[in-house]
Amino acid sequence: YSAEKWATLRDNIMEYGELADLIHEYNPTVLSNRSTYKDQKNKNLNDIYDDYMKDIDDIWDQADNADNDVTWASLRYSAGLLTKQADNNYEDAEMEKIQYDQQEAKLVYQAQEMMVSLEQSAYNLENLQSTRDLLQQQYEATQAQMSVGMATQTDVLTALKSVQDQDTAILTAKKSQENVHRNLCLMLGWSADAQPEIKEVPQP
């Protein structure tokens, strides 16, 4: 990355267009996978393969000297297993790289979905609060009506319950929003209680 690009990734601003880079650089799972892959690559795979081949040759020598068919068959089976393991180990590092890349792509997609969800939850909370304000007005109006004999105690209690139910819905929505916010921050390298500035998701 350029110095300017690094600066934008570290500016405490969460932008939709930067999610892939943030995942690549700061996601704990991606960082762990990258470390594991480097360790695997640092091993001399050719030496490991050669060691397997030597072991297999030794087994074949034992098989040639086997004094019965059962021993020969058993050694031949062992040689076959080792050959398969040698081939698998030789390919493991690159296969892991492919799997890690696929996992990283999935994490980017999840982060994108979560950022969209976070924006939608903000609109949802606004609507819930607007509805709550209306229900509060209705409750107060019902109280006023009861004072002049135009509504019953039951009407007042029903109106009050509507306000309380709406408060519960708002609380649930806020908790859900906080969970998404916290998990998204952790995915992108921020702390769980971080409060980065979150930009709007661009329109498709």
Regions found by a protein language model. Give the residues of each.
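Helix-turn-helix repeat elements of alpha-solenoid scaffolds
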Residues: 88-94, 132-136
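Short amphipathic coiled-coil heptad-repeat segments
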Residues: 176-199
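Amphipathic alpha-helical coiled-coil segments
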Residues: 82, 86, 96-103, 165-181
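Extracytoplasmic/secreted envelope proteins and their assembly/folding machinery
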Residues: 16-20, 115, 136, 160, ...
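Bacterial Sec-pathway N-terminal export signals of envelope proteins
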Residues: 1-60, 64-67, 71, 78, ...
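Charged, solvent-exposed structural "stalk/scaffold" segments
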Residues: 124-172
